[in-house]
Amino acid sequence: MKIRSLLAAASLVGFAGAALAATDAISAKDQKVANKSVTAALVAASKAGYLVVHEADATGTKAGKILGNASVKAGENKDVTVALTSDVEAGSKLILMLHEESDGDTKFDDKDKPVMTDGKVVMQAITVQ
């Protein structure tokens, strides 16, 4: 009986993990740029891809120049750090955006398109402190 209960509990945990992995999301807070990098506390990806940091307009809604990227695996990725190619000033807005690995070359390039959920790009705007 104990074994059957353990197996049932394990299958429920596995199911919950699979459900989380199927949800694409980014969680990041406003932060100081330390060592020319920014960190997302959590990136959930249904497929392997990239967390890409873009410059943003003053409202934090329109993505601009790409400042850096980091690979993410399918599933839950904690404390994903992206090295930036340019300095950013306090008060600047950045957009952290999830991109899929579209062409199978495992290198981020312009073929790796943003991930969309319900017709919206999966992204999180932050302000540099």
Residues covered by each model-derived region:
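Short, low-complexity, Pro/Ser/Thr/Gly-rich segments in the mature regions of secreted, periplasmic
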Residues: 118-129
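Short acidic/polar inter-strand loop motif in beta-rich domains
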Residues: 100-113
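Exposed aromatic-hydrophobic patches
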Residues: 39-41, 76-87
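Short, surface-exposed binding/anchoring microloops in extracellular/periplasmic proteins
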Residues: 22-62
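Short, aromatic- and glycine-rich surface loops/edge beta-strands on solvent-exposed regions
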Residues: 92-101
